[in-house]
Every structure is written in C-alpha cells, then in structure tokens.
Amino acid sequence: MSLVVGQSLGLTLVGDGLSLRNSKINVGKSKFFSVNRRRLARAALVQARPKEDGAAASPSPSSRPASVVQYRRADLADDLQAEARALGRAIDASIYSPELIARKHGSQPFKALRRSLEILGALGGFALKLGIDQKQGNLEKNMKKRAIELRRIFTRLGPTFVKLGQGLSTRPDLCPPDYLEELAELQDALPTFPDAEAFACIERELDLSLETIFSSVSPEPIAAASLGQVYKAQLRYSGQVVAVKVQRPGIEEAIGLDFYLIRGVGKLINKYVDFITTDVLTLIDEFACRVYQELNYVQEAQNARRFKKLYADKADVLVPDIFWDYTSRKVLTMEWVEGTKLNEQLAIESQGLKVLDLVNTGIQCSLRQLLEYGFFHADPHPGNLLATPDGKLAFLDFGMMSETPEEARFAIIGHVVHLVNRDYEAMARDYYALKFLSPDVDVTPIIPALRDFFDDALNYTVSELNFKTLVDGLGAVFYQYPFNVPPYYALILRSLTVLEGLALYADPNFKVLAASYPYFAKRLLTDPNPYLRDALIELLFKDGKFRWNRLENLLQQGSKDRDFSAKDALQPVLKLLLDPNGEELRLLVIKEAVRVSEAIALGTVVDTYNSLPEFLRSLVFNGNGNGPLTMSTAELQSTLELRDQVSRIWGLLQSSESFDPAILQPILQVLQQPEARRLGGRVAGGVGQRLAARFLQQLLRATTPSSAPSP
C-alpha cells in the first residue's frame, strides 16, 4: 500500500485497488477523537524524529511545503533510542511458526471447518473444470480462461489468497505463462474498516491520544488495502505532514488460519502429486514468513531506513523518513510524499518530466539493489514508484523486501556473460550456483531447451530483446524441468518486468535489457571480484584470441553508466595480468600485445606510404608502387581495423569523465614490478620477431617480386 497526492484528483493513494478520498478535519472537532484526559495528563509530548544517521535535515521541496515548521534532526544516539522504543512496542509481534499456528487453529475445529468449506466451495469448482479440460484435451485451449477464473477466485477469498496469488505470479517454475500473467494482475481491494477502530488502534499502540500526536488528520482513510489502511495527518509538534498506516483488525488471525489450512493442502500435494517436483510445503512456509513480516510495521520501518541508507545517496531517488516514536507493530508513521503514479504519463509530462527518465532511474537503482548490495524492493508496482514534482523517483511501501545472496549476485552477472557467449552448457551449470537445481540433477537434457529458445531470442540484439519475452521463455524451460527458483530470483524477474511494463506506457520500443547493459558492462570492467574477472576474461577471449570488438562494446556501454571510471577499468586488469598465477592469461595477452604493436607499426608504415607522392613510393618500397607490405588485401584490412579499434578503445577511455593522465601514475608504478618488466620484455621480443620477419619478406620480394601477392 502506497501514498501519493494525485495531480488530477487532489489527494490520491496509489496501490492495489485502493479507495480515494480527500477530506480533512481538525482532530479536536472530530467525533472520532475521544481524548483520554488521564492518559493525556501523564503523557509528555513526544518529539519524534526521522532516522538519518545524524545528518543535517535537507527538506525536499516535493514533500515539505515552505509553511511547514522545519524540525531539527536528532543526533544518532537520540535516533537510536527512538528506534529502540519502537522495537519495544513491537516486542509481542508475531513470528510465523507452523507449529504455533497448528496448535492454535487445530484447537478451533469448527472455525477451521467453516473456512475450509468456504475455500473448497470456491476452489472445488475450479478444480473440477480443470479435470474436465484435461479429460477432453482442452487444457491448452482453455488455459487463459481458467487463469482469469483463478484470479477472480483468489480475489473473493480475501487477503491471504490475494497475497498467495501475487506470490505465485513470480514463480515460473510452478505456473504456466498464462497463469503468471493473470495472477500478476491481482490487486488488494478490500473495503475500509471503521475509522473509530483505526483511531482506537493508534491510541492503544502508541499510548497517546490522537490530539496529543496530531493537529489534524483525515476523517476517513486515504486508501485501504488487504493488510491495513492509511490516513493523512499533520504532526502537532512540528507541522510535518505524514502518512499513518494502521493495520486491519483481526488480519493476523485470518491469515494464520488460512496458512494453517493451506499447509494441509501442501502436505497432500507433496505426498500424492508426482508431477510437481518443487517442495510445496517449503514454498508455503517461505511465503507465509514473508507475509508475517509485512504484518510487523516496525520491521517495515527498519526496511525503509536500511533502504534509504543504501540507495538514497543518489540525487534523483527519494525515500521517505520514518517517525519512530509514532511507529509500532500495527501503526507506521512516515513522511508524506507528493507525487504521481509512474503509469500516469500525461500527468507526469504536464509537469515537464519524462517517464522514461524516471523509469531509467528505477532500473539503475534496481540493478544496484539486486547486484551490488543485495537488499531490494520486491514490489515496485506503479503505486510504489512515484514521480515527485521536482523529478525524483520516490520509493514507497517497504513491507515486501528481499535479499540476493552475495554468491548469487556474481553468478547472475556470470550468467549474462554465458548468455552473450551462447555458452549453453555453462548457462545450465550456472543453475547449480544459483541454487535453481540440486547437485544431483543432470543438466544434459536442459541444454537443448536453452539452445532452442535462446538461439531464436538472440537473433535480436540486446537493444531489441524484450525482457518479458526472455522471462516467458525461461519460464517455459523452468516449468518443464525440475527447477526450484529461489524467491529472490523470482522477485528480481518480477521487478524488472514491472519496470519494463511501466516504460512501455511511454515508449512501446523501450527494452529494459538495453537500459541495463551499461550497468553490467561497468561491473565487468571495474569490479575486482575474482569471479567477475574470470567472467570478463571468458567474454573477451575465445580460442586463444582476444575479441577487441567485445571490449570496445563493453567500454561504449559501460561509459553510459554514470559511475563508470576509466581508472577503475584499467587497474584491476593490470593487477590480474601481473598475478603470480596468471601465466596462462599472460601468454594470451603477450600474443595479443604483439599483434596490436605490429598493427600499430604496420599501420604507420601504410599511412606513410599513402602520404607519399606516387613516384616516391616506387623508389622507397623496392620499386613497388602498389603497396609497402607483402600482405594480402584481407590481411592488411584486418591489421588496419585492429589498429583503428585499439585507437577507438583508447579514445573511449580518454572520454571518460573521470579520465585524468594522473591515473597512469599508479599504472606506471605497477609496470615497475619485476613481473611487469618481464612481460614487457616478452612483448617487445615478440614484436621484434614479427617485424623482422616482415622485413625479411620485404627483402625477398625485392629479389622475387612475382612471388608476393599484391595488397
């Protein structure tokens, strides 16, 4: 659930099928605010401050009107104390435990039976239709229709099944593409609960009257979703405008009962359904654990704080502050963000902003989340990504977060390298490192399936390849074979697919892979991690030959990334070359350095030859007016292209904003090392031998000119 002030409707809350209202009242005049005088008398006015590691406040024009009284940011110690108090209020927050929910709901058989009949009544008819389709051979024909029916059934069954369907929409190893597409459309769409209950919950959770905390609050929720609803309010002590999210009464009880029943179905599937190879019970428990974390709003606040610390250093990214002293396990108070949904193209463009710029910011931030720090926003739907009036991209709603293990981050980048190289055997082996397959699974049958799909997909260039097409194709492979896609990877696919979908509103030709490639190129060129260094070597060398076109393309793409550094690109490569264990690579580099040096020298000769008057060419080059070298036309063109390619690569390095001749100083220091001097000597020796051979050929051509082909 997320907040935004819409450009056309006034106050708008964006999210999953949320209701819209825009009225406001004074707290003191509302019939809902019954002030507990005894509690008010003993309660001091709490000076809640957002957490920001002690940095000075930097009010955002998009979220802090000039009329708002600016608050003084607390120092780190006070801030940690405020967070500790919030944690204390959440000390009794429930943690998902299959044993505890079984003990609790197993002792309430009539309640469990009533809900079971409700679920069976909804899903039983659907299962019967599937059985008839299978018997009549109409499964494929009716798949889209059945997927729509399942989405509607999940919506009717309430929050747990809406969340379950959203989770299934990220699992290509469990659901066919038609079901993935339909379940991804599931939206939270529950009616609001009474405002009196919400206000009572705030007072109960924070142990303060509303009048003490707020000077005004909307009398009705700005939005309502499955787990809670949100009010817009103004803090009394500072005038700060905030969003206050209040948890739906009884939601934890309802979700616990549903997961108790769903686990029972999972046990039956694991025991009796052979064609589903995934451990369904483990999958259910992982998902239930994630939903229970969303029920703890202090956990969500900590997620927001961590996210802000990692990613809000960029000028074009906004993460709202948390007000810890007004936050508990059922109440979350955070900075109000004004903005426009990212799929409202006309509203965004009317402010002089470009949707594609904002989406590209989202893609670059998401790539950093997924592959640098590993802590990422797992629910980037349009309501959680807002365009602020000053052009920033605001991230909201941090209930659903996930983490990418460090080894998986590098494995994903390596997987991209294997894809570019069309090395399908290596791609299949990557699935072990990514934990998609258990070590005892033979990947041999999977390789042809990867080849069949990607050979067709890679007929397009990276800039032409549609990410959703790629995901759908991979999903078909995952569905056919015994894959168990980890939750983090499924959420990665969903995040990037959503971002590409948002971009397609503005530009039907936009491709998220093309926008992502500069980041991958920069990481390959600059990251000193040994795994990525090996991946770079694998990308650039083939059959003992260096692929200069690959390096040129990487530099072209990497230089588009705002964080690209020529210094970072040069030094790790040199260190790799001079590593005591790098003899095999040095042999390849020596061979290539000889080729390049020869190409530069011979290119200079050709340029000199071409600049001479025609009568001098015959005099200088042994009476031959057709060319200076004993080389075929194809060989000469290849040599000159190599020289020009190296020249362009050097130009790309020089054009980097971070390029400074001073970066060569540490490189020269590296070259003073004994191994570097030996390497240089071997290169010089190789160049000398090649040029001597060329010179000897030239002399022989002078005595037997007919034996040498004309260039």
Curated annotation (Swiss-Prot):
EC numbers for this chain: 2.7.-.-, 2.7.11.1
Record: active site: 379
Q: Where in the cell is it found?
A: Plastid, Chloroplast, Plastoglobule; Plastid, Chloroplast
Transit peptide (first-last residue): 1-42
- Give the matching Gene3D superfamilies: Transferase(Phosphotransferase) domain 1
Annotated GO biological processes are:
cellular response to nitrogen starvation; chloroplast organization; plastoglobule organization; protein stabilization; regulation of tocopherol cyclase activity; response to high light intensity; response to photooxidative stress; response to red light
* Gene Ontology cellular component annotations, sorted alphabetically: chloroplast; mitochondrion; plastoglobule
Tell me, in one coarse class, where this protein mainly resides: plastid
Q: Name one GO molecular function term.
A: ATP binding
Question: What keywords would UniProt list here?
Answer: ATP-binding, Chloroplast, Kinase, Nucleotide-binding, Plastid, Stress response, Transferase, Transit peptide
Any phenotype upon disruption? Suppression of the bleaching and dwarf phenotypes of plants lacking ABC1K1 in red light, associated with the rescue of chlorophylls and carotenoid contents as well as D1 protein level, product of psbA, one of the four core subunits of the photosystem II (PSII). Slight reduction of nonphotochemical quenching after high light intensity treatment. Abnormal chloroplast ultrastructure with slightly scattered thylakoid grana and reduced starch granules accumulation in normal light.
Q: InterPro entries, alphabetically?
A: ABC1_dom, ARM-type_fold, Kinase-like_dom_sf, Prot_kinase_dom, UbiB_kinase
What is catalyzed by this enzyme?
Answer: L-seryl-[protein] + ATP = O-phospho-L-seryl-[protein] + ADP + H(+); L-threonyl-[protein] + ATP = O-phospho-L-threonyl-[protein] + ADP + H(+)
Which residue ranges does the record assign to the Protein kinase domain?
A: 216-546
In the UniProt annotation, what is the result of changing residue 301 to V? Answer: In rbd1-3; suppression of bdr1-1 and bdr1-2 bleaching and dwarf phenotypes
Documented effect of changing residue 405 to S: In rbd1-12; suppression of bdr1-1 and bdr1-2 bleaching and dwarf phenotypes
Q: Which SUPFAM superfamilies match?
A: ARM repeat (SSF48371), Protein kinase-like (PK-like) (SSF56112)
Report the enzyme's class at the first EC level.
Answer: transferase
Summarize where ATP binds, as residue positions. Answer: 222-230, 245
Q: What family, per the record?
A: Belongs to the protein kinase superfamily. ADCK protein kinase family.
Q: What does the UniProt record say this protein does?
A: Kinase that can phosphorylate the tocopherol cyclase VTE1, a key enzyme of tocopherol (vitamin E) metabolism and involved in the recycling of oxidated alpha-tocopherol quinone, possibly stabilizing it at plastoglobules. Also regulates membrane prenylquinone composition. Required for photooxidative stress responses to prevent photosystem II core and chlorophyll degradations. Together with ABC1K1, contributes to plastoglobule (PG) function in prenyl-lipid metabolism, stress response, and thylakoid remodeling.
Q: How does it assemble?
A: Interacts with ABC1K1 in plastoglobules (PG). Interacts with PGM48.
Q: What is this protein called?
A: Protein ACTIVITY OF BC1 COMPLEX KINASE 3, chloroplastic
